[in-house]
Amino acid sequence: TLRRKSLEAQLLTAREYITNICESDVSTVDGVQRNPVWTSLILRSYARNISTLAKKTNILKDVSANADGITAPTLDSYLNALERLFVIEDIDAWCPAIRSATVIRSGKKRGFTDPSIAVAAMGLTPEYLEQDLKTFGFIFECLAIRDLKVYSSALGGKVSYYHDRLDLEADCVLHLSDGRYALIEFKLGSREIEEGAQHLLEIKNLVHQAIENGTTSLREPDLLMVITGGEIAYTRPDGVKIIPIGCLKD
């Protein structure tokens, strides 16, 4: 189909882009000579951990299996170069005073500026992703975050995420420069919408309680939204909006 051909063309472009990054850009960005094979391994490991809170130590362990002699400072140097090239772009944690600071996770969520780079780095195809819905879910999250950043940039939009050690999470918190913010979950399939909506309502309730107790200066979230891979937009009776990813630009 036309859509499949367009996806394959995008992936071909992304693969060529990765070759350029590994063979030249990663060294020319700051004049430090870097190993193309190591760069490729780092990109692949980062892509495998996309949309997760994987620690750098885990990525180093993963890369070390095939890159003998790579150290933590070397990995940092490569990752800094990839950030400067706008290839990888991590997401910071949102740490509001609604739970004890020790309960809220504060590590960075691993991300790419464009999900097609992650797909190409792992050597995956659209057909493979249709079979591996778990990986597709992580890629879908990266795609939705990219779109949210683009469409909210005129409003000073910034994104973070919320995740605590009790496993309550919002995949994305979108903050606008006027103080408004939205709690967002990303769910590929319709069966997961309920779980996503409950997470958002629970976080909203925590914010409400913290306001009542006078322990936060936060306002309540202005929007609760589950972004899906479906085609129908609607508002649930509890106020959570279900929005297909294709409707975001509207």
How would you name each of these model-derived features?
Residues L2-R180:
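Accessory nucleic acid-recognition modules appended to NTPase machines
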Residues Y181-E192, H199:
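Active-site ExK catalytic segment of metal-dependent nucleases
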